[in-house]
Amino acid sequence: MILCPQSNMNVATGIAPARKYLERGLKVGLGSDLAGGSTLSIFRAITDSVVASKLRWRLVDQNLKPLSVADAFYMATRGGGSFFGKVGAFEEGFEMDAVVIDDSALYTPKKLSMHDRFERLCYLYTDSKIVAKCVAGKKIEID
């Protein structure tokens, strides 16, 4: 299944128990539904899914821990890619789909780990930070 958290929140259909789906071993991808949302940004979908899962945890089921950014990133990449074949991961035999992002303008007073840099990027992302894109191993033009 594909979860579109912003759309679900905007049209008030509820908050999916994403953690439960993952724990059951279901294939779960993350999407951005422009019909019910306001952006196609997968980074926004990542942060919205984390926020939604925290709300579900706090208001509905405190036994079901909220998603982490790493969980949501998995759903946005490997989870969603699992529906389309060998995409969504940097592994041998998989198609190379990637973006190169420059986060140097996101100031921080201390050195951050790669995990912390990525989490910060998810919450502060704009398209202007993409410096290169690759689809199926080929560099493509940036819009």
Which residues make up each language-model segment?
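Catalytic beta/alpha-barrel core
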Residues: 4-8, 34
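Context-gated lysine
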Residues: 6, 20, 27, 54, ...
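Helical hairpin unit composed of two closely spaced alpha helices linked by a short loop
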Residues: 10-12
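His/Asp/Glu-enriched, well-ordered alpha-helical/loop segment
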Residues: 14-107
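C-terminal cap of metal-dependent C-N hydrolases
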Residues: 95-143
